[in-house]
């Protein structure tokens, strides 16, 4: 098991340059690694053995029957899930059928789980890929190795001046750059909600309330309720195989199939249900947080003061008052990457320059001061 995660840690590396939020990293780093690990686990015989084992008479070769039932779907009977195991049925959902398809629950997902998990991992990484493309290495370029703070005073002074000149010359031109990141965060929210609906479709409408059903089942009298994990992920199902008999007539053969992979699948998807709910809540709160930041300069001042206590309050207020939301976002990202003393000096120098130059050029009308 550890070998799988060792192989994945290089696949989803977190850069030492911080260009996004912790919640955003949960999507493209932790979640992607979890999904990729699950995808590999369900394809590894070392952990689950053969994916399907069907039992029948010797008239049908075992490999033929297993292959047929793996390629086609297996089924259970809905009316038999509440029957008493051991006296009425051998296993929930398994028993004699009347040949009608009305009562059948077909399990079509079984062989597609690993591919679905892999596809989900790609979808979770897509907003990160988009932001990397849009961010363009701006933060790393502006850092100029000022994050370590170990360089000569002359070199440090030159780099701080270059950074200050860039901020001065491009002040109020970073809104679209910041909005692109907010779009990526919103796409992460759309993705995780969309994947809940995707998995609900994948499991024939049984996934959306899966976690709640499991909790309800654990709290109720289990003799009176259907186990949702057994209902969605049965260990034993039936498979119908047709072949010609010795007289040329079509013969129907019912086989019992053991699905050992579902022991793993149920754990995977009960975890993913709760994990996706947590991600949805955290990302929704993050989106509301971003909306407040966009429309509230006071909140931007408060957050900078809270995060970077070495920077003087009056310097922060001057910068926020004379800049836009995109500049705030860039400065916040720089502050999380630069040496704290260097960032304090840059912020103070920028505030002094803004204070001494009241007519700094502004896009739009001359002399206009915009808060957003």
From Swiss-Prot:
Cytoplasmic side stretches: 1-21, 127-182, 289-372
Membrane topology label: Multi-pass membrane protein
Localization, UniProt: Cell membrane; Cell junction, Gap junction
InterPro entries membership: Innexin
BP-aspect Gene Ontology terms: gap junction assembly; monoatomic ion transmembrane transport; response to light stimulus
Assigned keywords, A-Z: Cell junction, Cell membrane, Gap junction, Ion channel, Ion transport, Membrane, Transmembrane, Transmembrane helix, Transport
Cellular component GO terms, alphabetical: gap junction; plasma membrane
Pfam families linked: Innexin (PF00876)
Gene Ontology MF term list: gap junction channel activity; photoreceptor activity
Domain of life (superkingdom): Eukaryota
Extracellular compartment segments: 43-105, 204-267
Presence of keyword Phosphoprotein: no
Membrane spanning residue stretches: 22-42, 106-126, 183-203, 268-288
Quaternary assembly: Monomer.
Function: Structural component of the gap junctions at electrical synapses in distal and mid-depth levels in the lamina.
Family statement drawn from the similarity comment of this UniProt entry: Belongs to the pannexin family.
Protein name, as recorded: Innexin shaking-B
Organism (species): Aedes aegypti
The gene coding this protein: shakB
